């Protein structure tokens, strides 16, 4: 069966420019998710809408290098550079996960010049929930 031709006007016209860059954000929340394989840094406003994000993978690190502290530092610097231009002065930091990039990302955030209200560890800890997987035998 042949495809029908696309209808004109069925899609909305594309937005020119970014609507996120027009806002002034004086205060925000910086979420750092540090796993053993990667570190993801997300900057949101206080209502939780994403303003900027970066990860070690998007910064050009591949394979095992994504889990390194230097990769986390680079990812945090990239995410914060975008929001510093939008006027963010204060932030809260939420750190999640056991990865190596936790401290390096926090160091990069402190060096950026944004005042930190508090730093909170929000790593999920089970209250003896699900049974963990069996131990590996190598």
Swiss-Prot record:
GO CC list: chloroplast; ribonucleoprotein complex; ribosome
A UniProt-annotated Pfam family: Ribosomal_S11
Keyword set includes Ribosomal protein: yes
Principal subcellular localisation of the protein: plastid
Residue ranges of the region described as Disordered: 1-24
Subcellular location: Plastid, Chloroplast
Listed Basic residues bias regions: 9-24
Family membership noted in the UniProt record: Belongs to the universal ribosomal protein uS11 family.
PANTHER family: 40S RIBOSOMAL PROTEIN S14/30S RIBOSOMAL PROTEIN S11
NCBIfam families: PRK05309.1 (NF003698), uS11_bact (TIGR03632)
Subunit and partners: Part of the 30S ribosomal subunit.
Name of the protein in question: Small ribosomal subunit protein uS11c
Gene coding for it: rps11
């Amino acid at each position: 069966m042949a495809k029908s031709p696309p209808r004109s006007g069925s899609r909305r016209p594309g937005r020119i420019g970014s609507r996120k860059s027009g806002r002034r954000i004086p205060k925000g929340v910086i979420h750092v998710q540090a796993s053993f394989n990667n570190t993801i840094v997300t900057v949101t406003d206080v209502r939780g809408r994403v303003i900027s994000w970066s990860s070690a993978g998007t910064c050009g690190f591949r394979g095992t290098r994504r889990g390194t502290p230097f990769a986390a530092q680079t990812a945090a610097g990239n995410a914060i550079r975008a929001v510093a231009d939008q006027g963010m002065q204060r932030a809260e930091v939420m750190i999640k996960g056991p990865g190596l990039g936790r401290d390096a990302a926090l160091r990069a955030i402190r060096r950026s010049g944004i005042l930190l209200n508090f730093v909170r560890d929000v790593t999920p800890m089970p209250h003896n929930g699900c049974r963990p997987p069996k131990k590996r035998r190598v």
